[in-house]
Amino acid sequence: PASRGTVGARCVARATAWISCASAEDVVALLGRVREHAGDTVTSFEMLPAHAIDMVQADHPDVRDPNPSSLPWRVLCEISMAREEHARETLETALADALEVGLARDAVLAENLTQAADFWTIRESIPLSKRAYGTSVNHDVSVPVSRIPAFLNTAAAAVAEVAPDAEIVAFGHVGDGNLHYSACEPKGVASPTLGGISDRITAAVHREAMAHGGSISAEHGVGRLKRDELAGLRSPAATAAMQAIKRALDPQNIMNPGRVVPDQG
């Protein structure tokens, strides 16, 4: 339970749920429904594909899906409030509402901190378990929240044109539209091929992210690696405007030269 200490610090109490959803559209709508009840106290809302859970379980046989289901998506939702009982009641009410209208098909509310930590262990194990699964071509993109389902559909189709056998693993922070999007080599493939066509896969994913009003760099920045690609994906006028702003603010070009904005020749 939350309490105020002698230095005036307030502890934060959290309520955490593991939810099964039938579609990416339902995941996005579920976020809106939970926010109707919890507002800005929704501090985490992670969408996880069932295939990623399978990868974690293959890598860590002791890990169990808190709510086994044939549905394609899981959501790890957490709200944070001053009082534990208030957080739990709010999330329970939101989940009951979501279950009634079909946005959530099933849900497990963590009974204690240990169970909540177990939920998070699954989420945090995905990157390393994906690596153990095999070769993957990874991306860090963002799209407007409302466009997440459409992006997932068109990006999967675009990747399939380049790498028909690739397995897609997309997971991330629905609340801000940040997605970790990977094209993975099928398990046990005799001759891995994705590494040789990674540039084409990345171009396809990034093109779709931009087409949906998103960004090719969500959490990890643009830097030098994505600078030229980003310039190629936006209009010359947009690049020229950014260069003009850069010159006005940094006429000596001493702040991160050559990063994000291409140098003018």
What are these language model-derived features?
Residues P1-G265:
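Noncatalytic alpha-helical scaffold of FAD-dependent oxidoreductases
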